């Protein structure tokens, strides 16, 4: 895994390597064509971008250099922003990240959806393989189990909830305030809903070119995206949260407007939606997603995190067991079949002496064969679950010498 995230890179650096869904699909296909790579998945969110590959052990090509080539940037300039993980380290990272434990806001839910969508995008483009497919399915299933069994005691666990919470601590008030939310996607709807719950007068932008009825959160007003600047000076808060690679607000669009009262712009997107230069204008304050951080973890949460740790360790062990023994299934099937044939040969003389209709003898022989096959398979898979992978491999080698 090659990744860049909020821990090692600024928002300016992260946005260089972010991908829209269409861009990610194109890059997936390019990487999958590289000799030695069996599968590829790209995860691109507001806080991180990760390239996951399943490859042969002898594969030595740098994924980082491939990525820089695709993005047309100097591979020496951003190397410090990236981290590479492999083996157990990569597995552990994916499991904990999918649960939201590596997010800026611990336990946030959106990352689970984003990981699932990353897997689905790879599937749609035939870029995954059995190893990545199984790894991501294990991580997603584990995260669902965690969220079902353990409810983290984090107030305002989603991004917008945390943003509102932090702003309240800074004495910002929302009740009765006019808010413009640019973007009616998942994050935009979450933002609009939360602000409406806070008692704000919320307006949401919608695109004219979209066909059919466009749903917006209950209690909110709507305007066409193209009209977003007409009354922007009247708002107290302007939140932009789109997945577009293009900015929604440029300095040049605001420079001729007169902001008579303070307006807080909040940019929740990566790449950024709002031109950072707008802070040059009077009465304008801009916060991007890096401004909001979680500072403390409660004792109750620490206990819950230990419980989550136990669940994830168990699930990771299950995946590792599958990975280490994924080539053993055919061996077990062969050994079980050969053992069943051996049993059949050993009871053949006895079967011939039994006074029984030939059809019944054939049925009995088939039943014995099937039962032997199942019993031997059960014994071997049971053994696998109670010894180390190395010991199990040794046992398989020994049994292959017998059958």
UniProtKB/Swiss-Prot annotation:
Residues involved in substrate binding: 45-48, 103, 108-110, 114
Annotated Gene3D superfamilies: Glutamyl-tRNA reductase, N-terminal domain, NAD(P)-binding Rossmann-like Domain
- Tell me its EC number(s), please: 1.2.1.70
Q: Which residues form the signal peptide?
A: none
In this protein, the active site sits at 46
Report disulfide bridges, numbered on this chain: none
Q: What is its pathway?
A: Porphyrin-containing compound metabolism; protoporphyrin-IX biosynthesis; 5-aminolevulinate from L-glutamyl-tRNA(Glu): step 1/2
Q: What superkingdom does the record give?
A: Bacteria
The entry lists its GO molecular-function terms as:
glutamyl-tRNA reductase activity; NADP binding
Q: Site: Important for activity. Where?
A: 93
Reactions mediated catalytically? (S)-4-amino-5-oxopentanoate + tRNA(Glu) + NADP(+) = L-glutamyl-tRNA(Glu) + NADPH + H(+)
* GO terms (BP aspect): protoporphyrinogen IX biosynthetic process from glutamate
* Keyword set, alphabetical order: NADP, Oxidoreductase, Porphyrin biosynthesis
Q: Where does NADP(+) bind?
A: 183-188
Q: Which InterPro entries match?
A: 4pyrrol_synth_GluRdtase, 4pyrrol_synth_GluRdtase_dimer, 4pyrrol_synth_GluRdtase_N, GluRdtase_dimer_dom_sf, GluRdtase_N_sf, NAD(P)-bd_dom_sf, Shikm_DH/Glu-tRNA_Rdtase
Q: What class of enzyme is it?
A: oxidoreductase
Free-text note on domains in this protein's UniProt record = Possesses an unusual extended V-shaped dimeric structure with each monomer consisting of three distinct domains arranged along a curved 'spinal' alpha-helix. The N-terminal catalytic domain specifically recognizes the glutamate moiety of the substrate. The second domain is the NADPH-binding domain, and the third C-terminal domain is responsible for dimerization.
What this chain does, per the record? Answer: Catalyzes the NADPH-dependent reduction of glutamyl-tRNA(Glu) to glutamate 1-semialdehyde (GSA).
Question: Per the similarity annotation, which family is this?
Answer: Belongs to the glutamyl-tRNA reductase family.
| Misc note | During catalysis, the active site Cys acts as a nucleophile attacking the alpha-carbonyl group of tRNA-bound glutamate with the formation of a thioester intermediate between enzyme and glutamate, and the concomitant release of tRNA(Glu). The thioester intermediate is finally reduced by direct hydride transfer from NADPH, to form the product GSA.
Subunit structure, briefly?
Homodimer.
Tell me what this protein is called. Answer: Glutamyl-tRNA reductase 1
């Amino acid at each position: 895994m090659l990744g860049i995230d909020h821990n090692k890179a600024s928002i300016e650096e992260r946005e260089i390597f972010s991908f829209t869904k269409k861009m990610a699909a194109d890059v997936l296909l390019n990487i999958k064509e590289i000799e030695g790579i069996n599968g590829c998945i790209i995860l691109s969110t507001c806080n991180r971008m990760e390239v996951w590959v399943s490859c042969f052990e002898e594969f030595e090509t740098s994924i980082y250099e491939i990525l820089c080539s695709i993005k047309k940037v100097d591979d020496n300039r951003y190397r410090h922003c990236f981290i590479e993980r492999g083996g157990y380290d990569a597995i552990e990272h994916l499991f904990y990240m999918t649960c939201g434990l590596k997010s800026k806001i611990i336990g946030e839910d959106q990352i689970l959806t984003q990981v699932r969508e990353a897997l689905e995008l790879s599937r749609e483009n035939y870029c995954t393989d059995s190893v990545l497919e199984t790894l991501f399915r294990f991580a997603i299933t584990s995260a669902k189990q965690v969220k079902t069994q353990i409810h983290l005691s984090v107030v305002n666990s989603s991004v917008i909830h945390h943003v509102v919470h932090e702003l309240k601590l800074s004495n910002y008030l929302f009740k009765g305030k006019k808010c413009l939310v640019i973007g009616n996607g998942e994050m935009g709807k979450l933002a609009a809903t939360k602000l409406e719950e806070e008692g704000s007068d919320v307006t949401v932008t919608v695109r004219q070119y979209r066909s059919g009825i466009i749903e917006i959160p209950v209690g909110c007003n709507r305007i066409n995206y193209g009209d977003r600047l007409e009354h922007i000076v009247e708002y107290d808060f302007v939140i932009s949260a789109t997945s577009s690679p293009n900015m929604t607000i440029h300095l040049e669009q605001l420079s001729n407007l007169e902001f008579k009262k303070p307006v807080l712009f909040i940019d929740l997107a990566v790449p950024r939606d709002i031109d950072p230069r707008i802070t040059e204008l009077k009465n304008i304050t801009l916060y991007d997603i890096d401004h909001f951080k979680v500072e403390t973890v409660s004792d109750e949460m620490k206990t819950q995190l230990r419980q989550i740790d136990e669940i994830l360790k168990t699930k990771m062990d299950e995946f590792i067991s599958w990975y280490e023994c994924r080539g053993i299934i055919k061996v077990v099937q062969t050994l079980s079949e050969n053992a069943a044939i051996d049993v059949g040969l050993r009871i053949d003389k006895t079967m011939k002496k039994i006074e029984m209709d030939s059809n019944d003898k054939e049925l009995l022989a088939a039943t014995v064969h099937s039962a032997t096959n199942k019993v031997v398979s059960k014994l071997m898979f049971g053994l696998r679950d109670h010894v180390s992978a190395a010991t199990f491999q040794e046992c398989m080698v020994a049994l292959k010498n017998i059958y």
